[in-house]
């Protein structure tokens, strides 16, 4: 799988950039959509998972560090872009329509940055404690985000009517977010 990921990762970036260049309006609409905006956090998780594979399987610390830095930059940019945009929107959907398990991808993104940072820390020599503190901060921040989001999802499950179609694939992310946390 590692070899496949090394091939698929750049292809996904090329396709993502092509989508931005060819369909700017759709990408902009996705950033402002409560169901799709959080999906952009998958780029952070993918970047850091590949970085983890580089450390564990590929034994390429340099590539892993580059991917970790890219993951941090992507995470920081997306946190401000996605959450700020959704927060300041004038028109907002009701909670039952606006929240789903896909929101937990933001947690998975933060936790993946933390995991890769912890894996890389031993390679930083005297700076290892700094990397570990940063990884801990990311993990704790992701944990807080998990508590906030899962509380809203639980509230939605418990107090709003649900149909089988409401249990679409994004709801299954609930378990993945708990696992990485």
Residue locations for each model-derived region?
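Transmembrane helix-loop-helix
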Residues: 59-70, 74
């Amino acid at each position: 799988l590692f070899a496949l990921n090394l091939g698929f990762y750049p292809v996904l970036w090329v396709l993502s950039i092509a989508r931005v260049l060819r369909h700017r309006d759709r990408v902009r609409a996705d950033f402002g959509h409560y169901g799709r905006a959080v999906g952009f956090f998958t780029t952070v998780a993918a970047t850091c998972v590949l970085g983890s594979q580089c450390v564990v399987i590929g034994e390429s610390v340099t590539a892993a560090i580059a991917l970790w830095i890219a993951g941090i930059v992507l995470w920081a940019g997306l946190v401000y872009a996605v959450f700020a945009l959704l927060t300041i929107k004038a028109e907002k959907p009701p909670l039952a329509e606006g929240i789903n398990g896909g929101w937990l991808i933001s947690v998975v993104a933060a936790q993946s940055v933390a995991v890769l940072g912890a894996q890389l820390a031993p390679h930083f020599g005297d700076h290892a404690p700094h990397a570990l503190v940063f990884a801990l901060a990311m993990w704790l921040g992701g944990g807080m985000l998990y508590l906030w989001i899962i509380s809203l999802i639980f509230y939605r499950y418990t107090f709003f009517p649900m149909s089988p179609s409401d249990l679409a694939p994004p709801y299954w992310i609930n378990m993945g977010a708990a696992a990485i946390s």
